[in-house]
């Protein structure tokens, strides 16, 4: 073999067996907490500390690299086979250390003390907070940058933008925008106000948040609810699910006589939304947006079919997040 041919052969072998090492250039990223990290090599093992992060990781085709998730991570189904490393603020550091990940994708709700401790142990911890549509795009691209899947991330974001733009185009010129309440509980009446993820989805779907005057997530009185009189009421799947699989939060709007005068109740316009897609800033938010557009404007988008009850579909254990709100310790999540 000629020397030049031998040299080329050696290069080809190196390309095959050392491709990842040769093809990776260290990247510097600043996460949503403002912390700067340098990813020296392409991660081969990943721990996700939030359901939203987990969905993004799997959407990018990185499921086989996941070695740890939270007990609230439930999508895709393969996630249920992964080692759990605790909850949000109750992450189990020992289990994370045992998994020995190359990178950890965290959420602010994991607690700054936990995040700082993991960093002191030498782990690359990237904090992601996708609390808006644009924030979701950024989160997907951040994970893509950190894992060498930029092309896949860009493709997902492009598809999401195309689908959202299609909704916006169909709503051009529409002036009838129903008033919408997103209810998380009754007594107290917890609602999604302005500056919330749900408020943005309601607006994009051609509606008006009935409680836009409430900042963030907050409680409104019965009197305010009756006076505001939303045309459409949304509740999350899994919210206070009964043992028979019925959504007791949805049912309570129809059984509480004090609410019988509400327009949404009289017109039976109280809808169940898939909480895993409606409350998580991941790739599937477009599904909820398309469904919400059907609810608000069936004359344009067709009729809406409510999701299967959480009693028979996987993964509504994330509802403890809502329970945390009701208890006064709001853990918004999903993420």
Could you say what each language-model-derived stretch is?
Residues 26-28, 35-39, 45, 102-103, ...:
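Extracytoplasmic substrate-binding proteins
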Residues 91-101, 116-121, 221-229:
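Short helices/loops that flank or line small-molecule/ion binding pockets
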Residues 1-26, 305-335:
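Secretory targeting signatures
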Residues 110-120, 234-253:
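A ligand-binding cleft/hinge motif common to bilobed small-molecule-binding domains
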Residues 213-216, 224, 237-239, 247-248, ...:
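Acidic/histidine-enriched, beta-strand-rich ligand/metal-binding domains
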Residues 44-99, 103-109, 114, 207-210, ...:
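A short, structured surface patch at a secondary-structure boundary
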